Amino acid sequence: MIEFYRPYMEELGFRQQLLADGETMSFDPRGTIDFPEKKWAEWYRRWLEPEGGERFYRYIRDSCSGELVGEAAWYFDDVRNIYICSIITAAARRGRGYGGEALELLCREARAMGISEIYDDIAPGNRSVGLFLRHGFAVVSSDDVAVLVKRQL
């Protein structure tokens, strides 16, 4: 079982580690992402203050052990006029069902905020396409850059 946890700014070290881990970020064509402490305050203000329908961010925590295992988010893409979601599970914690549970919880949270559909852009060949399809998403479009999936909430 998992739960979402809203981190304090001082706890963004977990996100920093997650984004710096090559195996965890192997799904992203950009590879690892630099997230130095000097960027935390601005990022925190943008993603977690104030809360509303434009952005949502939480750590994924194993509710039995209390261990942080990943992150879940959505944001409103005002260019395409859609909500984009993101689930990142630490590589060392994959294969235990955390991603699927987090995806379901993220969709419930989005629905509770009045969001009627949610999307994700996934790199072609990424195993998570199957995860999204198993959890009610459908492929909207696909090219050599991204597979766009969508779920009605």
Please state what every model-predicted region is.
Residues 1-42:
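A short, well-structured alpha-helix characteristic of acyl/acetyltransferase catalytic modules
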Residues 71-76, 106, 113, 131:
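Long, contiguous binding/interaction regions
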Residues 100, 124-141:
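Conserved active-site alpha-helix within GNAT-family acetyltransferase domains
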Residues 33-84, 90-92, 143, 153:
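Acetyl-CoA-dependent GNAT
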Residues 135-153:
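Active-site/acyl-donor-binding loops of N-acyltransferases
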Residues 90, 109, 119-130:
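Conserved beta-strand-loop-alpha-helix junction that forms the acyl-donor binding cleft
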Residues 93, 97-105:
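Conserved acetyl-CoA pyrophosphate-binding loop and the N-cap/start of the following alpha-helix
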